[in-house]
From Swiss-Prot:
Function: Cytochrome P450 monooxygenase; part of the gene cluster that mediates the biosynthesis of clavilactone A, a meroterpenoid that features a unique benzo-fused ten-membered carbocyclic ring unit with an alpha,beta-epoxy-gamma-lactone moiety, forming an intriguing 10/5/3 tricyclic nested skeleton. Cytochrome P450 monooxygenases claO, claP, claQ, claU, and claW are close orthologs, suggesting that a redundant function or pseudogenes are present in the cla cluster. These monoxygenases are not involved in clavilactone A biosynthesis nor its modification.
GO molecular function: heme binding; iron ion binding; monooxygenase activity; oxidoreductase activity, acting on paired donors, with incorporation or reduction of molecular oxygen
GO CC annotations, alphabetized: membrane
Origin organism lineage: Eukaryota, Fungi, Dikarya, Basidiomycota, Agaricomycotina
Pathway recorded for this protein: Secondary metabolite biosynthesis; terpenoid biosynthesis
Entry EC no(s): 1.-.-.-
The protein's name in its UniProt record: Cytochrome P450 monooxygenase claU
């Protein structure tokens, strides 16, 4: 009897060793096959087997400049070393980028760990879906983001801006002797974005502009006060190689879990209240197909050929609430920063908007009738894209065409490259938006005039096929469904703020602004605690 535990323990250990060895052997076979089917490319040498070049990129003050430097040195398509000896192909060639985006969700899919992350914290919605599932969900959501739908909800954006104006005017009236007031603008832009997506998307007013407490706002704000610790960064770096890392606790995972639970509770409440409201209407209507929540309810109907499940409905609401809050608030904050740095641009924009003293621009005027507002908005979207990279995995062996031939690691000149199934491929989207070869020598500068007709026609950026030749909203089947919503809100809010206030840095236009990691990267005035951007605000007389 005494020998039995020893035998069982030895058997278990032997079994584990065999399983691990088999896993490692099969992994090695996959790596060898993938690399044998992938063109050998040039690239910078690895700094570490464990981290590859991840630490260099992560710690860089300007990772976009690194990507551009490597493209200049190794060619517009090159190879980077990743964690644990992995490799990825980086595309900075417009033709290659077009190829990837055109085959997105089928030929190129999300990295497994990213998809698992999306499922865990946001559900099986449109950002999780691939292939036919993604196509079905996108079709179900499209009516809510049509031009007609956005035109109908544009007054909501103006209303949020005027609520902010009322709150700021109250501050001014309580300080009548002061020449100007210091306002931390990023917090206010967060409130505008949250209230706008709540009302326009879900017929729910979070009331954050008026100071109403909000559980979801508290969770969003917590991301700006808790930076990723060393363990979070290490786990994120290694998660693609060791997916179990996603299950281990760390400070960021705890915040995402809390965010998921909070948004889930709010989504359930909003969906149920809307169902009851619609069921109470005469004729038993199923919601207005032109609103976000109405489209979701319609698509949930068993009679719809685009039917989506209740789980998918909740997942869409989670994603739309998060995206509607994060991205627009960051863009608005960057706009106020750049206009504070460039008072001449700020005044030129104010002059264009001056004809709207007694009324607001219509949606048509916001879209086509205010060229300088359009130029300022798109220059912000170009220079300060909220996300810096798109990463995909090759679903099946493929050949990617190149616009510019390059020399491979073996010395051959090629106009296309082969990528094996399982190869990781990434596009440095923000780098492409700032690439000197596409946008000119002033690509890193804030120059709205580049968007005016004569200047724009001369740029090589026309080779990029994305929205307005930008990759801010990416392209292809996964191009941002809400880009029209985001741009309309951006323009409406900015038009109100610039008509009524001037903005500048308290310590002058040379004030340093740095990146600060929240859910997405946010701006922060150096020296401030958290993602804060205090500006000196004056009323326009």
């Amino acid at each position: 009897m005494a020998i039995m535990p020893y035998i069982r323990q030895g058997t278990v250990i032997d079994t584990l060793v065999i399983l691990f060895s088999t896993w490692a052997f099969l992994g090695l076979i996959r790596v060898i096959r993938r690399r044998s089917n992938t063109t050998s490319l040039k690239g910078p040498p690895s700094e570490s087997f464990i981290f590859g070049l991840h630490q260099i990129i992560h710690k860089s003050e300007d990772s976009d400049a690194l990507y551009e430097q490597w493209a200049a040195e190794y060619g517009s398509v090159y190879q980077l070393s990743g964690p644990m000896g992995t490799k990825r192909v980086v595309l900075c060639d417009p033709k290659a980028i077009l190829h990837l985006y055109s085959k997105d969700t089928f030929g190129f899919v999300q990295i497994g760990i990213i998809r698992a992350f999306h499922e865990k914290y946001f559900g099986r919605g449109i950002i999780w879906a691939e292939g036919e599932s993604h196509r079905r969900q996108r079709k179900a959501l499209t009516p809510a983001f049509s031009n007609v739908a956005i035109r109908n909800i544009t007054p909501v954006f103006f209303d949020s801006a005027y609520k902010t104006k009322a709150a700021w005017d109250t501050i001014f009236e309580s300080n009548p002797t002061k020449d100007g007031i210091i306002i931390e603008v990023q917090t206010w832009m967060n409130h505008i974005s949250l209230d706008s997506i709540g009302i326009a998307g879900f017929s729910h007013d979070f009331g954050s502009i008026q100071g109403k407490p909000s559980a979801v706002l508290d969770v969003f704000d917590s991301f700006s006060s808790v930076q990723p610790d060393a363990m979070s960064t290490l786990m994120f770096t290694l998660a693609a190689t060791f997916p179990i890392m996603l299950k281990l606790p760390n400070n960021r995972h705890a915040l995402f879990a809390k965010l998921h639970q909070t948004i889930l509770e709010i989504s359930d409440e909003l969906l149920e209240s809307t169902r009851k409201e619609e069921e109470g209407k005469a004729g038993g209507g199923r919601g207005d197909a032109k609103s976000i929540i109405g489209s979701l309810i319609k698509a949930e109907s068993a009679n719809s050929h685009l039917r989506i499940s209740q789980e998918e409905v909740i997942a869409q609401m989670n994603v739309l609430l998060l995206a509607g809050y994060e991205t627009t608030s960051v863009s608005l904050t960057w706009a106020l920063i750049e206009l504070s740095r460039h008072p001449d641009v700020q005044q030129k924009l104010r002059d264009e908007l001056s004809r709207f003293a007694a009324t607001d621009p219509t949606w048509e005027e916001l879209t086509n009738g205010l060229p300088y507002l359009d130029a300022v908005v798109h220059e912000i979207l170009r220079l300060h894209a909220p996300l810096n990279e798109t990463t995909r995995v090759v679903a099946d062996d493929d050949v990617i065409p190149l616009g510019t031939p390059l020399q491979t690691a073996s010395g051959n000149i090629v106009d296309r490259i082969s990528v094996g199934k399982g190869t990781t491929v990434s596009i440095p989207t923000r780098c492409m938006n700032r690439l000197t070869g596409l946008w000119g020598d002033n690509a890193k500068e804030f120059v709205p005039d580049r968007w005016l007709n004569d200047a724009k026609d001369q740029l090589k950026s026309n080779e990029i096929q994305g929205y307005r030749h930008l990759l801010t909203f990416i392209d292809g089947p996964r191009t941002c469904l809400g880009k029209g919503f985001a741009v309309a809100e951006f323009k409406a809010v900015l038009s109100v703020l610039i008509r009524h206030y001037t903005f500048e840095f308290p310590d002058g236009p040379e004030t340093k602004v740095v990146g600060y990691m929240s859910i997405v990267e946010r701006p922060r005035v150096e020296g401030q605690d958290g993602a804060k951007v205090p500006l000196l605000v004056r009323r326009v007389e």
